[in-house]
Regions:
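Extended charged
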Residues: 1-18, 36-38, 42, 46, ...
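Short recognition patches in nucleic-acid-associated and regulatory proteins
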Residues: 19-33
Length: 122
């Protein structure tokens, strides 16, 4: 599994137990395949994913589903901004890194996500 959100792929990001599944942060007909390519997945146990109580699982819980999509979008935008900053040599040193990322996100990352996934969650 590839994830741009965590390097700890064997641990459920919600509860800390052993992961048993992958949750695609942008899912549905328009997003699952792209989420796979882009690393917009998190390791998760079955209870936190889709088998536990409604208020403790992602699927079947509209608020949790929406938040997972927002988290996925923010992670994608940051990754996009870092790639663009490297491409254009905009990151000169660590002190300027955060400002550069914010500028790139504000000037294209969100629109690029909208074009890639067909929607935006923010």
């Amino acid at each position: 599994m590839k994830s741009i959100l965590t390097e700890y792929l064997e641990i459920c990001v919600i509860c800390g137990r052993q992961s048993e599944a992958e949750h695609h942060l942008v899912f549905g007909t328009y997003g699952r395949e792209l989420s796979e390519k882009d690393g917009l997945k998190i390791p998760i146990c079955n209870n936190c994913h889709n088998m536990g109580e409604v208020i403790r699982k992602i699927h079947g819980n509209p608020m949790a589903e929406k938040l997972s999509k927002i988290i996925g979008q923010l992670a994608w935008e940051k990754e996009y901004a870092l790639q663009k900053a490297d491409e254009f040599g905009r990151i000169i040193n660590e002190n300027e890194k955060e400002d550069s990322i914010k500028k790139i996100i504000n000037t294209g990352a969100r629109e690029s996500l909208r074009k890639r996934y067909g929607c935006s969650f923010l």
